[in-house]
Regions:
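Basic, amphipathic alpha-helical segments enriched in Lys/Arg and hydrophobic/aromatic residues
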Residues: 255-326
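Structural motif
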Residues: 27-37, 164-165, 283-294
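Arg/Lys-rich, glycine/proline-spaced intrinsically disordered segments
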Residues: 29-30, 242-250, 313, 317-325
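DNA-recognition alpha helix
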Residues: 54-75
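Helix-centered, glycine/charged polyanion-binding patches within enzymatic domains
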Residues: 218-284
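Basic, short loop/linker segments at the boundary and entry of helix-turn-helix/winged-helix-like folds
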Residues: 2-49, 90
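Polybasic low-complexity intrinsically disordered regions
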Residues: 92, 96-218, 223-228
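Major-groove recognition helix of helix-turn-helix-like DNA-binding domains
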Residues: 70-95
């Protein structure tokens, strides 16, 4: 009996068929032997198999199973398999390119799925907090430069969440489609103290050209965000400053937009965290490793959407079970 391909193998093969961001000019020095997509394939394996260190990935790939044999073949270029040092170096550099890849993939999904065919072309922009692994670095210790416990991730930081209070960790900044399907279009991961409006331009520049309305909360009511939206031909709709209840002429329209935004982004955030165990501490330490985990999870979410669209499956209901079962 010929064994069937696992769903993980199917998803990894799909990476060869999706578009990638424009390649920059060649750098001086030794030419690149392995394409970026080879390491995207490895990233998908890491996210699905809950592997967060390079040696864990290589140990699992070395297992003598049919699935691992197939995956090793997909991670080979011109009959060459990367060395351990190459894996470490290229996977360390992968987070820098993930926002552009996610943006490119998001635009491709919008083109295929056409989520705005029957509704307004709006995007919700927001950030969600992820708790750091290990202990927390209290302000008094940080100011003294003292790290009281080795479990503390010193690259994380504090933020105050309206829902969770003070949290030590990271912020996952996301823009997603406001429609019947929640498609992540762009993403960035920073330490938790990064201001939402400072990261917003990077998210907005990656949006599909069809996106007309950008819906945000009060944190995005900032001159730099308005400027970027104006440059890119979009309309920014945010909560306004001042005491409640607001009585200006646009308040009723803003309430409608705010409701649409809340339904889209809050559902996506909860869906995403439920799939990738984001309600507890992240499984990684350090900015680069956490970027690779969180942005890699967004990429896997996009890949799962593409598979389910191609096979005429529901794009919201059943997605969590589908990814968990891979």
């Amino acid at each position: 009996m010929i064994p069937q391909e696992s769903m993980l193998v199917v998803l990894v093969k799909m990476i060869d068929l999706i578009p990638g961001p424009p390649v920059g000019p060649s750098k001086r020095g030794r030419p690149v032997t392995y394409p970026e997509k080879l390491f995207l394939k490895a990233l998908v394996i890491m996210i699905v198999k809950h592997l967060h260190k390079v040696h864990e990935l290589l140990s699992v790939l070395n297992e003598p199973t049919y699935e691992m044999q197939q995956l090793r073949g997909l991670l080979t270029e011109n009959e060459r398999y990367p060395t351990r040092r190459t894996w470490e170096r290229r996977l360390k550099g992968l987070p820098a390119n993930l926002p552009a890849q996610i943006g490119c993939f998001g635009r491709y999904l919008v083109e295929l799925i056409a989520p705005w065919a029957t509704c307004g072309r709006a995007v919700a922009i927001d950030s969600t907090v992820l708790r750091s692994k290990g202990g927390v670095w209290h302000k008094k210790d940080r100011e003294k430069g003292e790290v009281p416990h080795s479990s503390i991730d010193t690259q994380a930081h504090w933020t105050k969440s309206g829902w969770h209070g003070w949290v030590y960790g990271w912020k996952l900044h996301i823009a997603c489609v406001v429609a019947s399907v929640w498609i992540p279009l762009s993403a960035e991961l920073t330490s938790a103290n990064a201001a939402d409006n400072e990261i917003a331009p990077a998210l907005i520049y990656e949006l599909p050209p069809e996106a007309l309305f950008v819906l945000g909360d009060l944190h995005y009511n900032a001159p730099n965000v308005y400027e970027v939206c104006e440059q890119t031909g979009r309309l920014l709709v945010t909560t306004q400053y001042g005491p409640y209840p607001h009585t200006d002429p646009g308040v009723e329209v803003r309430r409608i937009f705010h409701k649409l935004r809340s339904v889209a982004i809050e559902n996506f955030n909860e869906h995403f965290k439920g799939i990738f165990d984001g309600h507890g501490q992240v499984p990684t330490k350090g900015l680069l490793n956490t970027q690779r985990f969180a942005l890699g999870a967004i990429f896997v979410y996009q890949l799962a959407l593409l598979y389910r669209f191609q096979h005429r499956l529901d794009l919201n209901i059943g997605l969590k079970a589908f990814i968990k079962a891979i």
